[in-house]
């Protein structure tokens, strides 16, 4: 193997929800500036997941952005043909990296922005309310709601997440 054919750095993304591992999957590390970590991974779900407003399916590729100091992650979703489907955002505690693992705790709230920017929707607010986080950790709940509001404010702009992800 020549020096020019180095394998890309890999890590495992671990998504935790309510103290349990929800999903774990391998990803290619694209960058880590000490605060923002970006990775690329194929759709890690089994089969097709149809939300009604978007379908995640085998062949889709996610370019995912995580922050060590922000309460969210942003995932650009592309179809197998390379076309952008949109951006799926998870409200999370700040990401924690440890060795070859990136651990992210999902706080139930989500946001979707379609590729054309016409469909911006808040998701799973009912799950968040039922989670009890506002009672068990009011500071985290407040940070989660503020993060969702901040992402929505970016999502409705004509340039969407362009500046955030640049």
Please state what every model-predicted region is.
Residues 15-20, 43, 78-80, 93-95, ...:
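Short acidic, glycine-rich loop/turn motifs
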Residues 32-35, 80-81, 114-118:
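Short acidic-glycine loop/turn motifs at beta-strand connectors
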Residues 107-150:
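A hydrophobic, small-residue-rich beta->alpha segment in the mid-to-C-terminal subdomain
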